[in-house]
Amino acid sequence: MSTQPSHRLYILDTDLSTNVSTRHGRIISCRPDGSDLRTVVDGIKNLPDGIVVDHDRGLMYWTSMGTSLSAEGGSIERAKLDGSDHKTIIASGTVGVFTPKQITLARRSGKLYWCDREGMKVMRANTDGSGVEVLWSTGNAAEEDDRRDQMRWCVGVGVDEERGFVYWTQKGPSKGGKGRVFRGPLSQSPFSPDDVEVLIDGLPEPIDLEVDEQSGTLYWTDRGDPPTGNSLNCVSIADVEGVMNGTARGQVRTLARRLHETIGLALDKSGGVCYVTDLAGGVYAVDIKSGQKTVIFSELGDTTGIALV
């Protein structure tokens, strides 16, 4: 297991365990071994959840779910990697940011993709916040019954520009064993229901995901119950295309277990490492080949999203 010494991790701490009136969420940066830990953005009160870094432009984008998960109050924020020039690019009240979750960047097209959990949507926009598109919707955010139906909740998102697909998770009920991984064609907006595929179902509770386009591998975290939940997992996309869902589930490889409400992940493809966070404050490095798990931090905060630059 190796990584480049110049790499840095960017980690979100929601400060979820603190009362909202005194909450100080933050974005933390460190080297992959945990050294040189610093806070780059502080005082975030609205529950930051997903983060992605634009390497070429030196910018980071993150989602904030808002101060209350029962009200529409999310947003998408942007700043330079040192925390300066912080601005909101998609404001609260915009369709698709009810409670936005994981966010990713399609590097060829320069488009942002994210999932909106209680908004029940898969979304896309330009990096300046313009051109907001609803790619997939599973319910009406104005209807409380829809928002409470966790089978409708879209959470994790990944983009494979090589093969032309968007992948996302719908986590299902907490610890319910009804989580699913979907995909739809990048070329469509919105997706035609006939072209949306369920690749894997019956998962404990899948959360964030990432695609290794070169190897055609899908990675995701799962915060469901053991033995297959609270884990980091992967599957070859070719092995689950066009097969029955139960068979697809049997192709999944679990890389790491015994995580504690695991959320975020960030791939270092050249180093063969996947960095993972959990809500108990754990930050881990997992060797993709051996599955060896190294604890970088055991209690960093209430950690969610993570990105590598």
Curated annotation (Swiss-Prot):
Give the UniProt subcellular location, in the record's own words.
Answer: Endoplasmic reticulum; Golgi apparatus; Endosome
Per the record, the major location class is: endoplasmic reticulum
SUPFAM superfamilies in UniProt: Calcium-dependent phosphotriesterase
- Report whether Lipoprotein shows up as a keyword of the record: yes
> Which keywords belong to this entry?
Endoplasmic reticulum, Endosome, Golgi apparatus, Lipoprotein, Receptor
Q: Which Gene3D superfamilies match?
A: TolB, C-terminal domain (2.120.10.30)
Decide whether keyword Lipoprotein is in the record: yes
Instruction: Please state what is observed when this gene is inactivated.
Output: Leads to excessive accumulation of lipid droplets and restricted infectious growth in rice. Impairs the cytosol-to-nucleus accumulation of MSN2 upon oleate treatment.
Q: Which PANTHER family match?
A: VITELLOGENIN RECEPTOR-LIKE PROTEIN-RELATED-RELATED
Tell me the function of this protein.
Involved in endocytosis, fatty acid beta-oxidation and infectious growth. Plays a critical role in the accumulation of MSN2 from the cytosol to the nucleus by activating the cyclic AMP signaling pathway. MSN2 can then target the dienoyl-coenzyme A isomerase DCI1 and other genes involved in fatty acid beta-oxidation, which is important for lipid droplets degradation and infectious growth.
Q: Which family does it belong to?
A: Belongs to the LDLR family.
> What is the name attached to this protein's record?
Low-density lipoprotein receptor-related protein 1
Organism, by scientific name, is Pyricularia oryzae (strain 70-15 / ATCC MYA-4617 / FGSC 8958) (Rice blast fungus)
Q: What is the lineage of its organism?
A: Eukaryota, Fungi, Dikarya, Ascomycota, Pezizomycotina
